[in-house]
A protein has these predicted regions:
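Glycan-association/targeting regions that enable binding to alpha-glucans and other polysaccharides
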Residues: 1-108, 116
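Glycine/serine-rich loop-strand microenvironments at binding/catalytic pocket rims
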Residues: 45, 55, 59-61, 298-312
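Short, charged/polar micro-motifs that form catalytic or ligand-binding hotspots
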Residues: 46-51, 96, 151, 158, ...
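Substrate-binding/active-site clefts of carbohydrate-active enzymes
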Residues: 110-174, 181-307
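Residue-level recognition of beta-strand->loop/alpha-helix junctions
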Residues: 177-180, 315
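Short catalytic-loop micro-motif centered on adjacent basic/acidic residues
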Residues: 223, 311-315
Length: 315
């Protein structure tokens, strides 16, 4: 059910809801019905959401007494080609979240920029640039070919987070949600290179276990970022850049990881990738081998829960 309430006195003659599911071929238009409520004109209508779990984007289109039209989205009143739609999430209401979720304060940490527990660490890979000046401006401008490598690191690590546990508890934090900590070759680490190991700049797997154990003493749970819809191209699974030897999915048609990805010449880079970013090849999420790797006994989720994680936020 949607309701649009124009400013009092606005010369609106018609109001429509425009909605578009992520898997829909075109926009759906719903004309909203005007009504007087407390001396104010409001427009109401019903939009039937898709049956499947997906995202739906929507905004409003207004017709004016002078014959013109405008759109209204989260960026306000604007032209059609400038509107920023709102997002509606269609979810499965039988899906259950952990009982503890939502019952306390969750604090999000971007590990590289939070706290450096071990100062002046050597870079574990030669293509990483260390920012010794913690007040320096991050690299944000594109390189000579228009790309962003996200290769500058400020050195935040797991020991730094552990050092701040008393401070976080004092603030009333109950859960720490960490942006990705797995080995990856960018400072944001959403391009996973190795799901089973902490990025060496952040520390070791043992450091993570210690962090979780110490956090529990303060009544704090550690929630990890589970980035399972895609990997990095620079990973031990895809290995386009060759950092991990001569094999793996991109280089070897017989690789056990090959079926995880969708290789096809119709894609710009020869494989399906997240929003067309060549460094983020998408995985076939229902591939049995991949599902077993992520969710099976001894797999990714099982491994990190055993190491002490309280749960996962799924990307």
């Amino acid at each position: 059910s949607f309701c649009f309430r124009p400013e009092r006195g606005a010369a609106v003659t018609r109001c429509e809801l425009l909605a578009h599911g992520e898997f829909a071929a075109q926009w759906t238009t719903v004309e909203l019905t005007p009504a007087q409520e407390d001396g104010h004109v409001v427009y109401r209508g019903i939009f039937t959401a898709p049956d499947d779990v997906e995202l739906v984007w929507y905004h409003f289109r207004l017709s004016w007494a002078d014959g013109g039209t405008s759109c209204y989205g989260k960026n306000g009143l604007c032209a059609w080609d400038a509107v920023e739609p709102w997002q509606l999430t269609v979810y499965d209401d039988t899906h259950k979240t952990p009982a503890w979720f939502g019952r306390g304060v969750t604090y999000q940490i971007f590990p590289d920029r939070f706290c450096e527990g071990v100062e002046n660490k050597p870079m574990p890979f030669p293509d990483r640039l260390y920012q010794a000046d913690k007040h320096a401006e991050p690299f944000w401008q594109p390189n000579e070919v228009g790309g962003h490598l996200n290769e500058d690191y400020f050195g935040g690590d797991l020991k730094g987070i552990q050092m701040k546990l008393p401070y976080l508890r004092e603030m009333g934090v109950d859960y720490l949600y960490l942006n990705p900590i797995f080995e990856a070759h960018s400072n944001h680490r959403y391009n996973t290179a190795d799901y089973l190991n902490v990025d060496p700049l952040l520390g070791t797997n043992e450091d993570f276990e210690t962090l979780c154990a110490e956090a529990r003493k303060y009544g704090i749970g550690i929630v990890l970022d589970g980035v399972f819809s895609h990997t990095g191209s620079d990973s031990r699974y895809f290995n386009r850049e060759g950092r991990y030897g001569e094999g793996d999915a991109y280089r070897d048609p017989n690789s056990p990881y090959r079926s995880w990805y969708d290789f096809d010449s119709r894609y710009k880079d020869g494989y399906r990738s997240w929003w067309g970013f060549e460094t983020l090849p998408e995985v076939n999420e229902e591939n049995p081998s991949y599902v077993e790797f992520i969710t099976g006994e001894g797999g990714v989720i099982d491994t990190w829960l055993r190491r002490g994680a309280a749960g996962f936020r799924l990307d």
